[in-house]
Amino acid sequence: LLLHAQHIYILGVRSSSFLAGYLNFYFHLLFKNVIYVQNTAAGEIYEQMIHIGPGDVMVGISFPRYSNMGIHAIQLAHDRGADVVAITDSQLSPLYPLATAALLVSYVDSLAAPLSLINALILAVGQRKRDEVAQVFADMEQVWSKYSIFGKAEDE
């Protein structure tokens, strides 16, 4: 789904927003078509998703206690014909029935397991796009070097 999406929307609300931000950081390096749905206010979420539709993929991340704001936004994506990749904890999650594909991971008041799953997803996509990723990182290395983005250890 992700490799052929016209646009990839990423959404996580409350504690899941950290996971969504992490996924967004790396997906921006892997894809040119990522939209990170910021959730500063309920109305803004829908404004950022106004163009979502068939051919798009919404990656929705939600764990107990499931935020209604996130559930409703993912429902909108589903209703507009976008595929939904749900990253959640169980088949009882309100995201599960909306999902085209569900990635289930244990969650007991810790983001460690969901973060590991997201890392595995990033690595799997990176493997599929190996040549493109190599070119992106070669380009990034040139930019980082030219503009002295990173400091160096004293012994380098």
Residues covered by each model-derived region:
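A short, well-structured juxtamembrane/interface segment
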Residues: 1-4
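Glycine-rich phosphate-binding loops that contact phosphosugars or nucleotide phosphates
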Residues: 6-13, 17-116, 120-129
